Each structure stands twice: as C-alpha cells, then as structure tokens.
C-alpha cells in the first residue's frame, strides 16, 4: 500500500522575535518529523504544500537546514514533491528561484502548472529536464499548483479542465494546493469557497493543503496539517502537525502526527490593578 507524509509551512529561515534560537527551532521540528515519520515509517514520498522557506531570498543557514534533511531523504530513496507558497514563490519577472534550483539539483521535485493564453496546461514530470506539473510515484498521481492568492477561485476552473485531461483511473489522484479555505480563518480576507473546492472532487481523492497555520480537515478528502512550528505566540495554541497517509483498496487513512520536537511556549498574565508606576509594578 502506498504511504506518504504530507507537510506544509515549514518556514525555514524564519527570524521571529529576532531570535537565532527560534530559527533553529523550525529546523529541529523539520528534522525530527523527517526522521520519525518519513524515514522511520519508510514512506514512498513526502509532500510539502508550500512555504518550504520563509522568504524568496534564502539565507545560507536556511539553505543548510533544508539540504540537511533533503539529503537524508535522498539517501533513503524517498522523493520529495513541493509546490510554491506565498512566502517562497518566484518573482514574476524572474525565472530563477531557490526552489527551482533545488529541483534542478535533484533534491526535490517542484511541480508547476503552465499558465498561458489558452488557460492551464499540465505536463508530466520530465526527469531529464527536472520539471513538470504532475508526477506518478508508487501508484499515486500528484498534481501541483501555484500560489494564486485571492484569484484562486477563478484559477480553479482552468485547473479542473486540465485535471480532467490527465485523469487516470489506475492511479490515486492527489492535488497540492496552497490557499486559505472559507470558514477556517479568523480574519476577513478572501478565501477559497468550499463549494468551489468541491468541484475538484470528481478528479481528486486527496487535497494536500498548506497556507493556514492550523490543522483542519474537510469531509475526509481535504487536509491541512498546519505549520510544523508556531510562527508566533498565538499560533502555539493551534493544533498542527504532519499527516501520515496510507492508501488502500477502500481509499486513504490520514493520521495527524504531533509527537516531534517543538518549542514550548508559556503565556503568563499579571493583575496590574492599582499599580500606578513601573516601580510599583516591579515591586508587586
């Protein structure tokens, strides 16, 4: 039975609270998850659904953190399949990016659909050119997508047409998508409507989401693991992790794995009633 690990929002290289230690926390989470649930579970492949890096311009330390685990996976014979997120997507006027370079160097497979005047085209992965829009691994057909932002609803129509063209009943179809989804946010920004998402259902059996930094599932076929580490204090209280997914004759079983190295955050509160000066507060 095919088995894979679904991650998202690693944000390698993040510099939160100007703390070098917090930057390393994100590496330790990534490293521990890979050792426990990718190599330890002998998965067939790993999916990273966007925001592998925290920024387009990747610092040397972040690249070291990425390659350290990518090299372990490559040595174990476990392919890594990645899509761009809003943090690490390539610039429109520049055909180069660090994710594309890592793909060219053989550390990962970056999946990118082709958008032109005719709509969306999906190309099978070409191992010689190290590029493509979908790839077949262990009986699973994995489709990639771009970071569409607030236009994701409109982009989905053309993407669905392309998915229909490349559907194969012999393969288990998985789509990687980096987007917010309606009903999962605490802030009023445009998100992909669930009704629009449901239009994928005749072509896709598992949607591997990223972008929202908390775990959620929709109807047993849409999965968002959340970020591996908390990007701020508020996020610490969100449920998050990595999905270990097994595919069988009756579909798939996705289990959220949460036991791995993370920074513990303690929130403390103080009653300052009646303390009128900094000195009085300090004494209290």
Map each language-model feature to its residues.
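Domain-start "cap" segments at the beginnings of catalytic or binding domains
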Residues: 1-24, 130-133, 246-247, 251-267
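Residue-identity detector for glutamine
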Residues: 31, 42, 61, 104, ...
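Generic alpha-helix detector with strongest preference for long hydrophobic helices that associate
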Residues: 7, 11-15, 47-54, 83, ...
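His/Asp/Glu-rich metal-coordinating catalytic cores
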Residues: 45, 56-67, 71, 75-239, ...
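N-terminal active-site segment of His-dependent metallophosphoesterases
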Residues: 1-69, 75
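C-terminal functional module detector
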Residues: 232-284
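A short, well-ordered alpha-helical element
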Residues: 31-42, 161-164, 279-284
């Amino acid at each position: 039975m095919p088995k894979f690990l679904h991650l998202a929002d690693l944000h390698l290289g993040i510099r939160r609270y100007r703390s070098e230690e917090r930057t390393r926390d994100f590496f330790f989470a990534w490293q521990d998850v890979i050792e426990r649930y990718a190599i330890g579970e002998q998965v067939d492949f790993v999916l990273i659904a966007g925001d592998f890096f925290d920024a387009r311009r990747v610092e040397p330390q972040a690249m070291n953190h990425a390659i350290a685990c990518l090299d372990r996976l490559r040595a174990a014979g476990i392919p890594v399949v990645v899509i761009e997120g809003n943090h690490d997507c390539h610039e429109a006027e520049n055909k180069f990016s660090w994710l594309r370079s890592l793909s060219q160097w053989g550390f990962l497979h970056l999946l990118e659909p082709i958008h032109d005047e005719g709509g969306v085209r999906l190309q099978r992965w070409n191992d010689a050119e190290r590029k493509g829009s979908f790839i077949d691994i262990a009986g699973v057909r994995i489709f990639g997508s771009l970071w569409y932002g607030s236009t994701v609803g409109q982009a989905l129509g053309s993407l669905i047409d392309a998915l229909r063209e490349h559907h194969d009943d012999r393969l288990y179809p998985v789509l990687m998508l980096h987007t917010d989804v309606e009903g999962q946010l605490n802030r009023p920004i445009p998100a992909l409507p669930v009704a629009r998402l449901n239009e994928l259902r005749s072509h896709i059996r598992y949607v591997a989401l990223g972008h929202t930094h908390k775990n959620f599932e929709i109807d047993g076929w849409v999965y968002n693991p959340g970020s591996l580490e908390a990007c701020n204090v508020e996020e610490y209280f969100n449920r998050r992790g990595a999905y270990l997914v097994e595919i069988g004759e009756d579909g798939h079983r996705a289990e959220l794995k949460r036991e791995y190295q993370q920074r513990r955050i303690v929130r403390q509160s103080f009653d300052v009633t009646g303390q009128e000066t900094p000195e009085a507060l300090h004494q209290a």
